[in-house]
Amino acid sequence: MIEVGDLKKGMFIIYDGEIYRVLEASKHFMGRGSGLVRTKLKNVKTGLVREVNFPSGEKVPEAELSFRKAQYLYRDGDHYYFMTLDDYEQHALSEEEIGDAKYYLVENMEVDLVFHEGVPIGVELPTTVELTVVETEPSFKGDTVSGGGKPAVLETGLKITVPYFIETGDKIKVDTRTGEYVGRA
């Protein structure tokens, strides 16, 4: 058990019988009485984010997880297949368990598989991934005057905003935490 005041970004806890990753945790004190710990939690299985306020002093169970290096192999229907690099064993995760990570997975990519009690429950992506632009509007002289960017569709189906100089077929780096353009690959 861990006290909610000690929660830090990146920790895993069990709340309502589900495993959550702590995205944010901040302490708020009232004028009188005890304070609150406001958290933003992401469900590891479904990817849904929820905000939860805990009274300070409350304790929550910490999830016992293990991480193993794996390679993304392929997608078949609504299942994604991975091979752990230490024992070459294959594991399948459903689209629900993968969540938004599906927009960043490219075949043969190395990721960390998240295991709980020996069963894979999710995937941890690298901070940035390289993806190819498959569809975007052509650039015209004078586009950059207004600033901003233009919409683009990437090889995984992810839709993001990219600078005007990016063309169809370009490889770009995308931040997996925010889904934003980082730079050219």
UniProtKB/Swiss-Prot annotation:
* GO molecular function terms attached to this record: translation elongation factor activity
What pathway or pathways are given for this protein in its record? Protein biosynthesis; polypeptide chain elongation
Compartment annotation: Cytoplasm
Which Gene Ontology BP terms does the record give? Answer: peptide biosynthetic process
Keyword set includes Protein biosynthesis: yes
Task: Answer yes or no on keyword Aminoacyl-tRNA synthetase.
Answer: no
List keywords of the entry alphabetically: Cytoplasm, Elongation factor, Protein biosynthesis
Gene3D superfamilies to which the protein is assigned, alphabetical: 2.30.30.30, Nucleic acid-binding proteins
CDD domains per the UniProt record, alphabetical: S1_EF-P_repeat_1, S1_EF-P_repeat_2
Q: Which GO terms describe its cellular component?
A: cytoplasm
Q: Which InterPro entries does the entry mention? A: Elong-fact-P_C, NA-bd_OB-fold, Rib_uL2_dom2, Transl_elong_fac_P/YeiP, Transl_elong_KOW-like, Transl_elong_P/YeiP_cen, Transl_elong_P/YeiP_CS, Transl_elongation_fac_P
Q: Which family does it belong to?
A: Belongs to the elongation factor P family.
Query: Which HAMAP family does the record cross-reference, listed alphabetically?
Result: EF_P
Cited function: Involved in peptide bond synthesis. Stimulates efficient translation and peptide-bond synthesis on native or reconstituted 70S ribosomes in vitro. Probably functions indirectly by altering the affinity of the ribosome for aminoacyl-tRNA, thus increasing their reactivity as acceptors for peptidyl transferase.
Put simply, this protein is called Elongation factor P
Per the UniProt entry, what species is this protein from, by scientific name?
Answer: Thermotoga neapolitana (strain ATCC 49049 / DSM 4359 / NBRC 107923 / NS-E)
Q: What is the lineage of its organism?
A: Bacteria, Thermotogati, Thermotogota, Thermotogae, Thermotogales
